Amino acid sequence: MVGAKPVENGSDGGSSTGLLHGRYELGRLLGHGTFAKVYHARNIQTGKSVAMKVVGKEKVVKVGMVDQIKREISVMRMVKHPNIVELHEVMASKSKIYFAMELVRGGELFAKVAKGRLREDVARVYFQQLISAVDFCHSRGVYHRDLKPENLLLDEEGNLKVTDFGLSAFTEHLKQDGLLHTTCGTPAYVAPEVILKKGYDGAKADLWSCGVILFVLLAGYLPFQDDNLVNMYRKIYRGDFKCPGWLSSDARRLVTKLLDPNPNTRITIEKVMDSPWFKKQATRSRNEPVAATITTTEEDVDFLVHKSKEETETLNAFHIIALSEGFDLSPLFEEKKKEEKREMRFATSRPASSVISSLEEAARVGNKFDVRKSESRVRIEGKQNGRKGKLAVEAEIFAVAPSFVVVEVKKDHGDTLEYNNFCSTALRPALKDIFWTSTPA
């Protein structure tokens, strides 16, 4: 293989021939995420190409993701379906875990949507395949819990393939009330009942995510958007969105039923498959590539989700295979030369209690502040008046995934210069050891 990657010696899964476990020749890097790298690989015995995901054991253990890895392996072995990425085999060495997976060459569905919304007939084909895969998983007691366009790949014939089962749950994970209780999923696609953390039906939560995906395919932008995470959660909780005028009445009706914030009245997967919009037959043959997107017009610009160059560069065809990349929110905690941002947000793998302790530590500097706290909120307030009254800083903690929380810190009252000084002399030093940073595996 051209550009083949040498493999470590036999103590780490290689052999004297430089092959992984004597069978696989590693080629070019396809992508990487927080915990894994994905390489093109070839089985020299069969000549078959695969996507080889390489996960560092040390990183997995460090952030407590051993169970998540085991779960992903179990789920992918259980769900064999034409629209689900297949796991061929799993190998391990002293320091790494190797997943030999189906090589999906068509890239991410996200890349198509990024160019503009899809025609309804095109979106329908993808949505039919998505629902087929999701229904298959649910019939085997498996809930994906992180469905989004970045987790949907396309093969060379344009058929959809669902990937990334790292957050999946089994029926046996249900508590006595018959509900799941772990907050999982990427914020913009998370169902309102998941945000509330009061227990939820995994099948209904997956259908909400399918509704968001369908909206994105048809509209070209997210139904729930806000620069402020708290405000976005409020919109999700209320089901506060508007369908664009170009959607057909049947499509609008289905999206609205999928994005019902009440899980008890949300449409079921059986009724989705029986809906007029869903049942309409595709015009293309099985092997005909899906048609192109619709270029977004100027009047649509206000609705689009604009991504920075750096964000776009991370969204390669295999980045989402690398174990929950969506939760590496990479702290929005950058330095500013002259002043602090009024609002900061960062991710951490520490529990909420550790975050609260660090915030209390910041408040103790100089004995100038009082602290009020709950399980998910901290308010730091100055004991004495400043130039514009007492300085008040609020922090709110959101559980986004089992191993990660998002912390939002903002000035609630007082003088900006005093807030800047508090951030640089007390808040930053207290928080610097807890916010999450990542390096490729």
From Swiss-Prot:
Gene Ontology molecular function terms on file: ATP binding; protein serine kinase activity; protein serine/threonine kinase activity
Binding site for ATP: L30, G31, H32, G33, T34, F35, A36, K37, V38, K53
Protein kinase domain span: 24-278
Region spans: Activation loop: 164-193
Modified residues (Phosphoserine): S168
Recorded GO CC terms: endoplasmic reticulum
Organism domain of life: Eukaryota
Location of Phosphothreonine modifications: T182
InterPro entries found in the cross-reference section: Kinase-like_dom_sf, NAF/FISL_domain, NAF_dom, Prot_kinase_dom, Protein_kinase_ATP_BS, Ser/Thr_kinase_AS
Keywords, in A-Z order: ATP-binding, Endoplasmic reticulum, Kinase, Manganese, Nucleotide-binding, Phosphoprotein, Serine/threonine-protein kinase, Transferase
Family: Belongs to the protein kinase superfamily. CAMK Ser/Thr protein kinase family. SNF1 subfamily.
Binding partners and assembly: Part of a K(+)-channel calcium-sensing kinase/phosphatase complex composed by a calcium sensor CBL (CBL1, CBL2, CBL3 or CBL9), a kinase CIPK (CIPK6, CIPK16 or CIPK23), a phosphatase PP2C (AIP1) and a K(+)-channel (AKT1). Interacts with AKT1, AKT2,CBL1, CBL2, CBL3, CBL4/SOS3 and CBL9.
Function: CIPK serine-threonine protein kinases interact with CBL proteins. Binding of a CBL protein to the regulatory NAF domain of CIPK protein lead to the activation of the kinase in a calcium-dependent manner. Downstream of CBL1, CBL2, CBL3 and CBL9, regulates by phosphorylation the K(+) conductance and uptake of AKT1. Binds to CBL4 to modulate AKT2 activity by promoting a kinase interaction-dependent but phosphorylation-independent translocation of the channel to the plasma membrane.
Protein name: CBL-interacting serine/threonine-protein kinase 6
Gene from which this protein is expressed: CIPK6
